[in-house]
Amino acid sequence: MTQEFNYGTGRRKTATARTRLYSGTGKIVVNGRPYDEYFPRKSLQMIIRQPLALTKNVESFDIHVNVQGGGVRGQAEAVRHGISRALLEVDVEMRSSLKRAGFLTRDARKKERKKYGQRAARARFQYSKR
């Protein structure tokens, strides 16, 4: 039998997180592994828990996340974005606090592409006057 869940998609840089919130005890699973195993750095674990701590729902939901693309920081921030969006489906009253904290805003900053005739996105080749 399928269990009722709330869904949220989060993105950051090239990372995409598909998040499902089930009513439960606070267990977070990322790509089939516990989140503290998938993100061993405490700072990244804190990023993931931020929307839950802000809305006082740390032990109210079991969260299953499928995240792809990007690096570990981008993935953690995509998960945070996805959890925040899924929490809105649970209770729309959380919107103001989540919005104020900036968890609902898609951070659109991406890596700028390298241009031809230059060494990098903005850096030019070294120029010798003489």
Curated annotation (Swiss-Prot):
Keywords, alphabetical: Ribonucleoprotein, Ribosomal protein
Database matches in Gene3D superfamilies: 3.30.230.10
Presence of keyword Ribosomal protein: yes
Classification via InterPro entries: Ribosomal_Su5_D2-typ_SF (IPR020568), Ribosomal_uS9 (IPR000754), Ribosomal_uS9_bac/plastid (IPR023035), Ribosomal_uS9_CS (IPR020574), Ribsml_uS5_D2-typ_fold_subgr (IPR014721)
Coiled coil spans: none
Source superkingdom: Bacteria
Example of a GO biological process term: translation
Entry's Gene Ontology molecular function annotations: RNA binding; structural constituent of ribosome
Region Disordered: start-end pairs: 109-130
Alphabetized PROSITE patterns for the sequence: RIBOSOMAL_S9
GO CC, any one term: cytosolic small ribosomal subunit
SUPFAM superfamilies: Ribosomal protein S5 domain 2-like
Xref: NCBIfam families: PRK00132.1
HAMAP family (alphabetical): Ribosomal_uS9_B
PANTHER family membership: RIBOSOMAL PROTEIN S9 (PTHR21569), SMALL RIBOSOMAL SUBUNIT PROTEIN US9M (PTHR21569:SF1)
Family: Belongs to the universal ribosomal protein uS9 family.
Name this polypeptide is given: Small ribosomal subunit protein uS9
Organism: Oleidesulfovibrio alaskensis (strain ATCC BAA-1058 / DSM 17464 / G20) (Desulfovibrio alaskensis)
